[in-house]
Design a protein with these regions (language model features):
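Conserved short secondary-structure elements within globular domains
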Residues: 43
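Canonical protein kinase catalytic loop motif
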Residues: 49, 54-55
Length: 192
């Protein structure tokens, strides 16, 4: 069963956690599954440049899996509204999500950060494979993947020339940038 997770910019992180616990009885397994899938979501949407990230496209399963639907915009082809880029954060990560797995000072947040770093470095280690797979899809007719120039996004995001330690620091900065992004809050509010 998949449901829309209502996120309100008015609610504080404790109210959001209470809502989550009411909807999804918060066992350690559910909390851990949410945290792990949120880490996967953050890294995947960043690397693939998934756009149109708003509450109607963010879902939570009854067992705590967090997922994104609607992959119509990718490789950084983000929508604009009235000439403004709607998505300015590397990925959607708000305090309400972090509250579900314990808040920024928790061990679970450190675990989340480490999972993001590990996933990012695994993708970086497989940079050539990813580019090869995307190259095979160029002839598929996808409007946002028409030629080799479209693959620049992957190179820029995966930064294969960096060391794993440098990439870890980049991911930590991306997490903080996403968490502090006020435009994300405004975008979420606009879709309520």
């Amino acid at each position: 069963k998949i449901e829309v997770m209502q996120v309100s910019v008015v609610e504080n992180e404790y109210e959001q956690r209470a809502h989550f616990e009411k909807q999804y009885p918060l066992s350690e397994n559910v909390q851990y599954r949410f945290m792990k899938s949120c880490a996967g979501y953050c890294v995947a949407t960043y690397v693939l440049g998934i756009g149109d990230r708003h509450p109607s496209n963010l879902m939570v399963t009854s067992d705590g899996r967090f997922l994104h639907i609607d992959f119509g915009h990718f490789l950084g082809n983000f929508k604009t509204k009235f000439g403004y880029k709607r998505e300015t954060a590397p990925f959607v990560l708000v305090t309400q999500f972090v509250a579900v797995f314990g808040g920024e000072e928790s061990e679970e947040f450190k675990q989340f950060e480490n999972l993001c770093i590990e996933a990012f470095n695994v993708l970086r280690a497989n940079f050539t494979l990813l580019c090869s797979l995307f190259t095979l899809m160029i002839s598929s007719g996808l409007p946002e993947l028409r030629g080799y120039d479209d693959l620049k996004w992957l190179y820029e995001k995966l930064c294969p020339e960096k060391s794993d330690e440098q990439a870890a620091e980049i991911m930590r900065e991306l997490i903080q940038e996403s968490l502090r992004n006020e435009r994300t809050r405004a975008n979420l509010f606009a879709h309520l």
